[in-house]
Amino acid sequence: MVKLALVVAEFNYDITHLMLQKALEHAKFLGAEVTYVVKVPGVFDIPMVLKELALKEDVDAVVTLGAVIQGATKHDEIVAQQAARKILDLAVESGKPITLGIIGHGANRMQALERVEEYARRAVEAAVKLARRKKLLKEAKYGGSTVVID
């Protein structure tokens, strides 16, 4: 069973709370166990807890959930891009799957609400698939024919 940690941004909590509920439902549907749910103030703060979660033995993958709503300045673009870059850096550094379930940048509130289920489900599904496939890859041995991990 894949063990997941979920990191949820509290900014735009009317949206991220729904994302959390959908993520929990989809994890259960996929047979994954959610071992941690960590709430952080905003999307920009998500990387602050990822390294700690990635070091835990009872976490196979981490799902990030958040919504960056478009404003009058480029703030949303900067927040989303910097968070995504650091999330990817931490995933590669830790060797554990960390998936991006962050709506935005450029989304307005209505668009974000329309994307809640899709982004939450896809982030959970990607985390579960990656964790399972990493385990299969670790155990795989080349025996003269192509090894396919799917």
From Swiss-Prot:
GO terms for molecular function: 6,7-dimethyl-8-ribityllumazine synthase activity. Keywords: Riboflavin biosynthesis, Transferase. It is an enzyme of class 2 (transferase). Its EC number is 2.5.1.78. The keyword Zinc does not apply. 5-amino-6-(D-ribitylamino)uracil binds at F11, V43, F44, D45, A67, V68, I69, L100. The active site is at H75. Pathway: Cofactor biosynthesis; riboflavin biosynthesis; riboflavin from 2-hydroxy-3-oxobutyl phosphate and 5-amino-6-(D-ribitylamino)uracil: step 1/2. (2S)-2-hydroxy-3-oxobutyl phosphate binds at A72, T73, R115. SUPFAM superfamilies: Lumazine synthase (SSF52121). It comes from the Archaea. Belongs to the DMRL synthase family. This is 6,7-dimethyl-8-ribityllumazine synthase.
